[in-house]
From Swiss-Prot:
Family from the record: Belongs to the TMEM1 family.
Species: Dictyostelium discoideum (Social amoeba)
Name under which the protein is recorded: Trafficking protein particle complex subunit 10
Function: May play a role in vesicular transport from endoplasmic reticulum to Golgi.
GO BP term (any one): early endosome to Golgi transport
Region (Disordered): 1-86, 251-277, 535-564, 1208-1238, 1316-1335, 1422-1442
Amino acid sequence: MSNVSPNSMNLNGSTSSTASVNDSGGGGGGGNVTSPTLSSSSASSISNSNSSSSNNLKPSTQPLSSSSTLNTPTQFSLQHSSSSSSLNNTNIDIIEHITISYQDESSIWKYIEAELPNHLPLKNISWKTKTGHTKVVEKMPIEILQYNDERVKAHYDNQNLYKKPYLYLYLVHCDDPDTYKNVVRAKIKQWVTQMTERQQEWLIVYVSLGPKRFSELTSKLTRTVFDRIKNDFNVKRDRCCQLRFLDTNNTSSGNNKDKDNDNGGGSSGTGLSTSTKQQDDLWDDFLIKMKEGIISSAEQYLTTYEDEIRKMDAKRTTPGWSYQNFFFIKEGLALIYERAQLYEDALMQYFELEVLFGDPNNRSQFDQITDEVLQPNSIHCNGNILDTSFKNYRKLIYENKISLFDFKVYLFARQSKLLFLLQKPIEAATKSISFITSMSMIIKQYPNSFAPMFKESWIFSTSMELIKACQDSFDKIVNGAQQQQQQQQQQLQLQQQLQQQQQQQTINGSAQKVVKSISSTTPISKLFGAFGPFGSSSSNTPSSTSATTAANGKNTPMPSNSGIASLSAGGSTIIAGLSGSQSLNNLQSAQLSGALNTQHYIRTPSLNLTSDLSERLTEKQDRESLDFLVGDLLFSSAQRLEELAIIIGYLPVDDYNSEMFFQNVEEVIFKSVENKKIEVDSMTAFSYQPLQVSLQSSKQFTQLYFELLGQIEKLYIQSNRMRSISRLTFAIANLNFKLKEFQIAENLFKSISNLYSREHWSYIEYAVKTRLSYCQKQLGHLVDYVTTCVGLLAPGLLTNRFEKDHYLSEIIQISRKPELNIVQPMIPLFKCKVTFKETVYRYFETIKINVRIKSNLISPIRFNNGAVSFVKSGFGDKLVFQLNDFLVEPGVNNFQFTAVGTTKATFVKDSIWLKIDNLSFGYSLRNADTAIGGGGGGTNTTTTTLPGEIKVIDSESQITLESFANSPLLFYSIQYVGIKLHTHSDTIEAGVLTFTSPTGATIIPTSSVIIIQSDDKTCETSSRTINLINDKLPLSQIGYNQTLEFYLPLMAVNTDTCTHQIRIELQHQKQTKEKFSSSLVSSILFINPLTIDESVINVNNRLFLKTIIQCNSPNMIQFNSYSLEGCDSEYQSPEQQQLQQQLQQQQQLSLSSSSSSISSISSKSSQQPNLYYLVKDHNHSLAPNLNLYPGQLVSLIFEIKKYENESLSSSTSPSSATDSSNSNGNNNNNNNNNNHSKNDLKLKIKYTSKMPQQDLDRPLIRECKSLWRDQNEFSWPIKIELPTYLYQIDLSIQSRAYVGTIVLFEIEITNLKQQQQQQKESNNDNGNEKQQKQQQLQYHIVADSQIWMISGKSKHTFSFNSDTVGEKLKFSCGLIPISSGSLPIPKVTLVGINNSNISYPKTKNEKIFVYPSPQIYSCHQLQDNNNNNNNSINSQTSTNKT
């Protein structure tokens, strides 16, 4: 093996010397590298591999402002003072990649080294994990180390498995087959055996120098050395590849290194020669096999770690489980992911470890909090929070010797590095805030482990460095997007130029020029500059400059990649490095106080980027989010800086929780600084250079502090965080307050004085208002001072009684100054509510309202005057209620304010005022929820008021009328309607009530009315009798709030349910001699007390009248008696009927002319004789005086019968038959003749209406009882519809017979009506109006086939003579019984005739007794008997027909 000068090449092809590279795991310095390396960890490689992830950001069109210093008279650097951070790259700047080891015993590495960068980084590497997920890396830089490099070890365990090379290359060059056979093959075999034992992926690379030999080109039988190698070592997989150099026929070695190829992608175009294509194929084969080996090793390493993690995780609940050991193994998996550029997977491992760290059992495994008591000048406070190179953290974790503080710092640094690599500065800033918060809690929890001022200096330095890192990362993302867009535009231009050149030049020439043009493009990474989380520019990577520095051992100062660049002495800007989302050096800001007093903040656009109008929405949102987080970090830094100033003595102590501020404020401002000031050498007390400079004097601190607050303000304004601006305003105002700049402090405090009161943050509100009040008192702003004192006396703000008394006495003293006129809102000291019962008052009437005042003070206070104003709708007059000289006690106070209504109008609540000397407390009542009462109604007009209104009236009547009744009322009985008269706020000097019924109800006249009079206020009741004059009720001398109640008797005699109207009219005169008239129309429902449903049931020519009676009365009634009129109580002969009719006529003549109309109607209806007589009353079981309640039913059943002579006359007389027919024909109509039909009956019921007992006990009811008729009568008409018989069928049969013998069955059919009338009433010929002289009829014998056999016709057609009434036709047939016993005779019907129109008189024999045969006959004898019977029947039938 030849000694080759160690070189290191980045992926862009630049060659440089090696540089010191630290362990990516944070271990101690890795030392100088003496072996040749091919480093892929430069900033350019990172940017090339990650630039695609920043495409979502819109590039800026303006360059970034990168000035790091200010042009000020006094200027000093805020870089790190630590030499380690100045000489070495921080661990976050160094990115480890996958390594490949090679062994070169033929001294051919120099050829590969020159060409290999043109084919890197590797692209599109993917593999599948055991979970089935596919890991894909688009671009993977690699680092190639020589086999004897100190970083390449012989054996690797779980501690450093992630450092193990992923592929071992064996480079061989041999042209002589014998030499290969005798020497080289054995060496290769030994090397392969060694790799196999280590389970390591390996690859043999055969390098050919010079062009192909003539034998290789002409003979295919000759085996080359490469063919022998493949034959010897390609056993299971092709692990051999070939490269060729120094081929004069191949020009790709010189030009192809500028080619932008894709690994394994084939040739680059059609313009290349055949030898060039073959050379590209060799390189593609080499790269493909290299990627296969890397993938295989990565899967092997991942499997090893995952299996180990799975085993340890399963034992997590067992005693003795070590969290640090588990962390060490799991971090190894994360480091593998990181080297493979799978940053999200690596970050997930750390997040899971952080979650496990939250378990108290795991956290308790850390034996010590810190290695030693940490001082503010220690290395931890010099701003190197992201640098893990100065301490071997992994070794400490492996040995379980790491402290809790170091572990938290290391875990955060690793997470931050991955977040920056993922280009997530916003998430990194969020993580930074939570990390600083948790670390401050640890420092506070273990104060013995940390020296004074360590917490403040550590938080300040850490926050400042994290701010710079986050903003640099964001700037790099934005610039990367901008550079990528520019590069795309350049490529587009080159393509256009190529098309133009192809038209003028040859294909080969044009292709070669295109390659040269592309290769001359500046890499994107070189445009980024120095970035902390991504590494720096080429000077910070393993480049020639850094390598020379490391080789010579000289500590040459280098620009820090993080930290604050400079501090301005002039006060314009403090942090030149805060340029992530805005260029703080170039911002043009107004004065601080003026900006903070502006209510509507205007976001300042970033001058270092394009205008916000041209930025995409996503970038603007990310920019605002980062500005807000950076602002919070910077504000935290400013607070820690202030705490350091307080400790040193530059500022007084800020105790927000101290009570009695008005007593302690003098001591805080004027005495605390002189008493507590200590001598501190900031250069030795702190290791962070900004703190060393800024804390040298009070002036430098003030300058730094105000500039920090100015930058915070701009960040908050640009991120639109108004609440944070308010918090910042308080910090600035408080600092001016301590510096006795009361005018500035007042303006700032006043701008946020009401913000925290609305959100009930009493802690902050107390601090704001106490300081504001002191400033106002010192400046002599007494009116504003009273306002602030009122705010301090709000409930829940002051807890000390002495403070409350102090500020209250201040208010009272200032109110006595005659030159002042102070107006304050009533809330929060007082709450008022105005109520009043009445809303309508008379002209010049005294009006009283109730005012409830709730005082939130702890002491009583006396007011000179109180006023409640009501204003007229629109504008003009006022109604003012007043109360003078009253004392308001703490809590609820009730007062009564009075006023006189001197203006007739409607007044609305306006305001309430409470006055102490020259101080007035006011409150608007326009939208207050005021309870009101009262209200009323007039006689002619209706007075309505809205809530909070008072109406003063003069000429409107408030009297109202009201009627009531136990609706519904009943017909045919005296009923009573109650009437109420309410005077309300009105009076009646004289008046009269008149009663009428527009609908015809009878108002029963009476001589006097009993009136019950009651007072609505005193509830006193009295009764008196008032005599009616001409049916009118006079009224006189009725005062305010009186109610008159009386009952009006009336009766209605309608037959159906109806509504009657009662009109009550009042005419009255007031004391003012004004006359008014009002009326009330009341609608009252009248119903029948009973509802009767009747039905006539015909059972075997017997008529039963069934009535169902239902009680409709709202009250219980007593069923006394009943009678059935229009029906004789018993059968009467015609002579008796004629005699009774004569007696009735004589009685009618003897009646006087003054008889009631009801008796006349009943007399007229009784002149005609009754058609029916009562056979039997089946209701004897009904109890006397039966009580019926509403809804109850009772049933009455009567058996009646119609006189035969009437039936006969109706059937024989043509006129009566026609009337009966018309009555039957209009069966479905109720509009019969006006005269009562002879078929009508009337059910008369006597009942007693019972009122409820509670009504009977009332005095007014008892007085009216004399007019009440106890027993009432109720009549209900009943119409009996009897069927009209058209035909009569008589059946005749002998009473007994024997089974099997023929029985003579005779049928006689009688015509009862004329044939023309039959056609109108029968259902057989509806609608046939044609006159016919004969009607064809057909009878049908319906016999049970199980009992009878019919001998003859079961159906027969016949006809009657049309002019004959009472005509009879006889028919007969033979019936043969086939069953013995009492058998029913068959039924005979007429086809087409309704059975209800056929009369079946009661036959003599409805049944026939059939006996078994008494003799036993032979067949011949039985046949002879049947023939004889048939002959006799036939002869009888022929006789009937004749």
